[in-house]
Amino acid sequence: MLKTNQKNVHAFEIEKQEPEAVMEFLEKNHALLQYFLIIFKYDIEPEVKVILHKHQLLFLETNRPLNGRHIKTMSLKEETNHSKPNHSKTEPKTTIYERHIRSGEEIYSANHLIFLGNIHNGAKIISEGCVSVYGVCEGAIVCFGECLILKEVKSAQIVFQNKILSLKEVERLLVNKNIKIITKNDDILDIKEVL
């Protein structure tokens, strides 16, 4: 009997563009991209493949359309213009972790997640819901929810709604220990500090 395992995968789809832009993206974000399948919607150039192999990134070349759930956010203006609420979609539950998340520990969840302890370097959090971290965050965070709340950040490995935070955006999180709320309006990332 054939032994198989079924896995859920988060992926980045890359459309056809200049190889230099793709190589720069891969070099800059290779540490975070190790957690994703990278799907190229075209035949990859040899120089791009060199970067993929160099960082041992998992990738797929295909022209076939892929089914799956696309992460789509609705602006606050669109949300408030609805005349009646949509109750057909169930709201994710909230899971609270009062303990520290240790190095090497991985948490995958469809729920909203609240962390009262620290997330240590080498830990990985992936959530379909919102994520709130009130301890020190040194690990990798991948949040597909409406918002990401962070207090003391010491990590550059943060993905919010399929966008890898740039060094400039991460630096805004590192300046102090105040709570920061990250949201996204269209493709614009908004980082607000709560005093």
UniProtKB/Swiss-Prot annotation:
The keyword Cell division applies. Keywords: Cell cycle, Cell division, Septation. SUPFAM superfamilies: Cell-division inhibitor MinC, C-terminal domain. InterPro entries: CAP/MinC_C, MinC, MinC_C_sf, Septum_form_inhib_MinC_C. Transmembrane segments: none annotated. Pfam families: MinC_C. GO terms for biological process: cell morphogenesis; division septum assembly; regulation of cell septum assembly. It comes from the Bacteria. Belongs to the MinC family. Interacts with MinD and FtsZ. Cell division inhibitor that blocks the formation of polar Z ring septums. Rapidly oscillates between the poles of the cell to destabilize FtsZ filaments that have formed before they mature into polar Z rings. Prevents FtsZ polymerization. This is Probable septum site-determining protein MinC. It comes from Helicobacter pylori (strain P12). The gene is minC.
